Amino acid sequence: DPRGVADSTPIECLTDRQLDRFLNVDPNPETDEDVAATVAVSKRFGPRCKTNSPDLAPNIGTPFVARDLDILRSLVGDEKLNYLGKSYGTFIGATYAELFPSRVGKLVLDGAVDPALTNAEVSKGQAIGFEKALLRFTEWCAGEKDCPTGDDPQAGVQKIADLLADVETNPLPADTGRPLTAAQAT
């Protein structure tokens, strides 16, 4: 795992209570107050990482991960890195190629994230893609026996939206002890 996540030394940014607040921010801010709350929660995230993981936080980021890959490449004795990256991994691969162009072997970047795009542009593109994928799913499901979203794809999309709206109001219990909210389900 890249430094700072999962089975590497994880960066500690938020307490459980703060993480709950962060994860449960309204996924569809509709009012100025909703947007302000989302921005406020998001702005507190980064500084808390620096406060709670002062030794690790300054060494987290894509260029560090790319450099770690180069160390691994060297340790296994390869002259060039052969790499398969998906989603964010495509950004890691592109960064590696930029930092170490003479050490690039074969790169497969599947579902490439354009490093020139802003986070807002990436998010917008993903939202459009997810919307298309959801409609395609309900179209496929409509042709199957006992499709839970029904035989009308648009109505199926609405059925899913209604379920998420219900979960926003009435979170579902989960084995983790944290309820499943609409923010976490989307």
Predicted regions and their residues:
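Gly/Pro-rich cap/lid or specificity-loop segments adjacent to the active site
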Residues: P2-A183
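Extracytoplasmic ligand-binding site segments that recognize negatively charged/polar headgroups
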Residues: T186
